[in-house]
Every structure is written in C-alpha cells, then in structure tokens.
C-alpha cells in the first residue's frame, strides 16, 4: 500500500511512500524530533505516532543523520534545497521524508532531482562504526516490529518555549524511544549540556533501548514564543544553515560550545577584555578600524568573512569598536574558527546593550584596572601646564630619569626653564595628532579618552613600536631640548677627568674662563645646540644640560696640541664632579640595552605585519584571478547569445 505524503503542504514535491518507507521515515523523524522537544513522554513505543503538524525535526540530529549517509556535502546541500527545508527554514515531516527519498535516490545512483523520488527506491542506508563493524538501517520490520501508519502531512510548526532561569541547566535530557513522538506542546525548551555531543547516530538495535540525547539544536528561538510568528522562520533557517555547513564544520569541535554558541561566558569575557586592553588600556575608549583590522587579520579568516564580522559588530557604523563591540566581533571570529557559520544578523546576546548590561563597569574596574588605576576620567583632566608636563614626561621618557645627580641650584633652574620651553611644543603636537586622528573617522564619537590612549593605540596597533627618541638632525624643532636628552648624562663626560675626548671639536674658551658661568651663558649654549647637532653625538649634545655649568666648557677645550696641558686643570677641577658622574654611567648602558630591545621589538612587529600583508596580498590576487576567469566566462556566454549575422 502506498500513501501520498505532502499533498497539501506546498513545501516539497508530492511523495508516495510504501509501508516500509512510512515506518522507517516516521521512526527516524520521531527520533530527530524528540531531540528538539526534550524527549517524548512515557508510554510503550507501539502506541505512539507522529502527530501531523505538531513537530519539527531538530537541525543537529538531522545533520548527523544525513552525514551518516556518506554522501558528499555538495549533494547534501542540494538535497536540502530540493526538499524545501532551506526555503522554509526548518524540517517538517514533509521536508524530512522528501530528503530521505532524495538520499535513497542518490545512494541508488540516480540524479538528485524531484523526478527521481517518484520511482520505487530502496531504503536509505546510514552507515556508522560500532565495535569496528558497520550497522545499517535495514528492514525496519525486523528491527522495530509493528508498523506505524502516517496520515497526510502539513507544515505547521511547533512552538517552543524556553526556560527563563538559566541556572537550571540540565546535564541530561529525558530518555526517548524510537517510535515516540514529541508532546504536542512541550512546557519549556530544555537546555541540555553538550559535553558529550551527538557525535554518532544510534543504530537500529540501539533504538530498541531508551537512550539519552545530549545534542541540542543551535538555532532555537532566543526568547519566549510570544515574539510572534515572524521571528521563527528566520531563526530556524539560521539553525539550518549552521547545521548544514558540513564541508566547513569540524565535527570534533561540536562539543566545545554550549547549546547557545553566541553567549559569551565569563572566561571568554575575561580573555576578550584582556585582548582589548592590550590594544587600548582605557575600556571606556575605542579601537580604531586600522588597529582592529591588523589585530583580527591574525585570525587567518578570509577577508570577506572578516568584513562581514565587522559589519555585524560595528553597531553604530562609526568605523571604530568599543569594548562591547570588540567582544562581539572577537566572539564571532572564535565561533567561526570553531566551525560555526556566521549568523545572518547580530545575535541578541552579542548586542552592545546586552553586553554592557551583562558586564557592568564595576567589574571592569576591579578586574582590569589593577595596573591602570591611576587613569581618571577626561572631565577631571585639567589642561594646565603642570598636568600636561606630567603627561608629556610619561609619554616621552620610557626609562628612569637620574634627577638625583643634579646637584647645583643653577642646573635645576636651567632644567626647569628647558622643560617649560619644550613642553608647549610637545603638547601642541599631541593635540594636532589627536585632531588628525579624529578627522579620519567616518563621524565623530562622543567618547572620552585619556591623553595617552590615542598615541599608545597608534604605537601598538597601527604602526610597529618605534625605538626611544633619537636626535633629529634636520628637524626644524630644537631637538636638543627633548626631555630624554635633557636628562641623559653623556658617556664621555663621566670620564672627563681621566680620558680626553676625540679632538674633533673646534677650539673653545680656556678652562680658566669657564668657572664663573652665568645662567645667560647656559641659555646661549642651549640655543647653539641645534647648529652643533650635525657634528656631535647625542651624548655630547646633552652635556650642557645634565651636568654643572663649568663642566661642558672645560670638556670642550681639547685641541690636539694641548691635550696634555688640558688634563692637569681638568683633573683639578673635575675631582668633585667625577664623583657625581660615576652613577649615571650604568644608566647610559641601561638605555642602550633598552634601545636594542625596542629595535628588536620593532623588527618583530614589522615582520608580523609583513606576513599579514603578504597573506592578504595572496588572497586578493586569488580573488582577482577568480574574477578575471568569471569575466572571461561571461564574455564567452555573451558571444554565444549574440545573434549570428549572415552576410
């Protein structure tokens, strides 16, 4: 006896089922539908039926069942489209039966078409390994006993409600029998742990015994069923797309995620926040597009996928990512790396409002600002010179400053005046840099950020970190007034009383004239420093600033013919000075080691950026090649479609 299925559904082609096909397909459908409803109710298997229009098959078990058919992924995608499940977004009984028919046709060697299911076909075979053997879904009468008749099928969907209290997460779902159908209206949507996963399909022999289901479909409704009928097909379709990306979904990663892969756990949140902090220390600030691009490109996802993730996560479309937007983008990338296809829209659990409510600011301050507790809001930052002096010193000087070696009051006065002269230029440059940086964005953001966040983000993300500042010989600004060089003691100056410096400097005034040096003379030497930058080393340039006034003049008088004469007054005058200059010498060596480390870091960053750009170049070249081939194919088709002119 043959029964027509799907006559009035319109979701798939009309289908004729024999008795054996009815029983086999209904049992498989009941098994897959039971996972979606949390398991059937108690009762003997023989008394249960698949109620029409009350159940839909879960996407996860259906995907595992179809993979057990050992058909290529392309064929499975074609079957999913032909049966109508991809169009309606879920597997009803009609779509499921048509898909099984198409699988049987493909296994029989027939083309995957709707015409192939009209002829008589053997039952589909689903092969898996158990105890190093093969088990097939063979004759259902031998495996399952009495037959079950199915009435005509409809495409009504069952409404699922979800438990609101998420602490009641169960570790095991109720058992089910092979012929049992799910209850017509389940009380809630069971959240089942995926610790073991539905890694293999149970065989027909295993179906004789009730077994717990531990696989849960991914794309169930995110809220109560009162959302309205319009929201269901979208989410079911997203679930279907996720489940049937078999060619890109590693099966071994299925157990790494809970039943809601788009919900960020506490451990993941801490990791994402730490990554954000490495790019931007201020969590109330944001990461620019170029910094995020360089960071996310290291995931080795394709450029179209990264672009799509950016479109989903950048909720306000301003070309930058806040902390919540960064966490959403990072979570999408991690999910994609673990085999989950990207959703068609940003899931509710990744919306910025949800993440901000889930991760309050107090937690951020406690967990993240342990080493950044000195930062304060922008509305409390004053723009006076003393506050900006501290900021500039923090930005420019990356190493301890030997201020304890400055002994005279004249030197302190000169250093203070030098700092006051150089600071307005640095502050103006920082302001101009922040203005240029803000002008590059699509539209301005009203977020507050500290005075150092932009510069540190540019150093860490957009460009490789640069070594400590060096003398700019051709720069129009007085580079000798840089704070680093103000506090740097010179290496030759430490041994000024013992070894003569190189005799390359021009003759200078006699040492006897250098004892009473006024503050005006010191300022005149500071003004002459830029002109001497081309012929003197950085350590020699810094000598007039970091040492007593008498020492630079005495050191400069070193002609070749008067070297021995100059050593005697130098030893007499520099006796007290050499004791003060012994301590800064290890600091200079320490600075050189820091410079080497900074250079090595810059080289490593440049190599990483070069590798990223090289891979990006290869991907773009491949895309260009594919587009070129597509163009040639279209031109050939156009030539064939043109009318032939007969002369």
From Swiss-Prot:
Main localization category: cytoplasm
Biased composition (Low complexity): 221-230
Localisation: Cytoplasm
Chain intervals with Polar residues compositional bias: 524-539
Interaction with ASAP1 as annotated region, ranges: 548-647
Ranges of biased composition (kind: Basic and acidic residues): 158-170
Segments forming a coiled coil: 599-640
Composition-biased stretches (Pro residues): 499-510
Domain of life the protein comes from: Eukaryota
Cellular component terms (Gene Ontology): cytoplasm
Residues in EF-hand domain copies: 301-336
Chain segments carrying region Interaction with RALBP1: 501-647
Pfam families, per database record: EH (PF12763)
Quaternary structure (record): Interacts with EPN1. Interacts with EPS15 AND EPS15L1. Interacts with RALBP1; can form a ternary complex with activated Ral (RALA or RALB). Interacts with ASAP1; the interaction is direct and this complex can bind paxillin. Also forms a ternary complex with RALBP1 and ASAP1. Interacts with GRB2.
Function: Involved in ligand-dependent receptor mediated endocytosis of the EGF and insulin receptors as part of the Ral signaling pathway. By controlling growth factor receptors endocytosis may regulate cell survival. Through ASAP1 may regulate cell adhesion and migration.
Name of the featured protein: RalBP1-associated Eps domain-containing protein 2
């Amino acid at each position: 006896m043959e029964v027509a299925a799907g006559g009035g559904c319109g979701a798939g082609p009309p289908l004729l089922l024999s008795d054996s096909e009815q029983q086999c397909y209904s049992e498989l459908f009941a098994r897959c539908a039971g996972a979606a409803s949390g398991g059937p109710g108690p009762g003997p298997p023989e008394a249960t039926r698949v109620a029409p229009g009350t159940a839909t098959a879960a996407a996860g078990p259906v995907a595992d069942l179809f993979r057990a058919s050992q058909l290529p992924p392309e064929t499975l995608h074609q079957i999913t489209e032909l049966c109508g499940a991809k169009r309606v977004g879920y597997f009803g009984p009609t779509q499921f039966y048509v898909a099984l028919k198409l699988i049987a046709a493909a296994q029989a060697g027939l083309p995957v078409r709707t015409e192939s299911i009209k002829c008589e076909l053997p039952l589909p075979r689903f092969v898996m390994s158990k105890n190093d053997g093969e088990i097939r879904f063979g004759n259902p009468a031998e495996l399952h006993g009495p037959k079950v008749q199915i009435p005509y099928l409809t495409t009504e969907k069952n409404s699922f409600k979800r438990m609101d209290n998420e602490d009641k997460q169960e570790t095991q779902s109720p058992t089910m029998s092979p012929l049992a159908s799910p209850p017509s209206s389940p009380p809630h949507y069971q959240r089942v742990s995926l610790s073991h996963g539905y890694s293999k399909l149970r065989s027909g022999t295993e179906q004789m015994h009730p077994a717990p289901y531990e696989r849960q479909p991914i794309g169930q409704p995110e809220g109560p069923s009162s959302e309205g009928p319009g929201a269901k097909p979208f989410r079911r379709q997203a679930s279907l797309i996720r489940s049937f990306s078999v060619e890109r979904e590693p099966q071994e990663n299925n157990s790494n995620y809970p039943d809601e892969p788009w919900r960020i756990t506490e451990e993941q949140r801490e990791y994402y926040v730490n990554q954000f902090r490495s790019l931007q220390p201020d969590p109330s600030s944001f990461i620019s597009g170029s910094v995020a691009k360089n960071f996310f490109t290291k995931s080795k996802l394709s450029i179209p996928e990264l672009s799509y993730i950016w479109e989903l996560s950048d909720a306000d479309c301003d070309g930058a990512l806040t902390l919540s937007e960064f966490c959403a983008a990072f979570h999408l990338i991690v999910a994609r790396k673990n085999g989950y296809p990207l959703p068609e829209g940003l899931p509710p659990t990744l919306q910025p409002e949800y993440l901000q409510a889930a991760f309050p600011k107090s937690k951020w301050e406690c967990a993240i600002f342990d080493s950044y507790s000195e930062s304060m809001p922008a509305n409390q930052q004053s723009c006076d010179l003393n506050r900006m002096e501290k900021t500039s010193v923090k930005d420019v000087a990356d190493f301890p400053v030997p201020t304890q070696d400055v002994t005279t009051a004249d030197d302190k006065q000169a250093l203070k005046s030098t700092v006051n002269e150089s600071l307005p230029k640095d502050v103006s440059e920082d302001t101009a840099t922040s203005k240029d940086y803000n002008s590059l964005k699509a539209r301005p953001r009203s977020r507050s950020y500290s005075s150092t966040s932009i510069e540190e983000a540019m150093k860490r993300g957009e460009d490789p970190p640069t070594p400590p500042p060096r003398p700019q010989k051709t720069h129009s600004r007085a580079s000798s007034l840089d704070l680093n060089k103000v506090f740097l003691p010179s290496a030759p100056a430490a041994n000024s009383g013992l070894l003569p410096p190189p005799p390359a400097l021009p003759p200078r005034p006699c040492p006897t004239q250098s004892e009473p040096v006024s503050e005006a003379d010191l300022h005149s030497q500071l003004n002459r420093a830029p002109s001497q930058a081309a012929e003197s080393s950085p350590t020699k340039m810094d000598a007039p600033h970091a040492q007593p006034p008498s020492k630079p003049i005495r050191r400069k008088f070193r002609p070749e013919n008067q070297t021995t004469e100059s050593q005697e007054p130098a030893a007499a005058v520099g006796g007290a000075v050499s004791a003060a200059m012994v301590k800064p010498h290890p600091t200079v060596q320490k600075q050189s080691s820091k410079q080497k480390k900074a250079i090595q870091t810059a080289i490593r960053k440049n190599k990483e950026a070069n590798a990223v750009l090289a891979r990006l170049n290869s991907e773009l070249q491949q895309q260009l090649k594919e587009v070129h081939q597509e163009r040639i194919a279209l031109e050939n088709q156009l030539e064939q479609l043109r009318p032939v002119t007969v002369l």
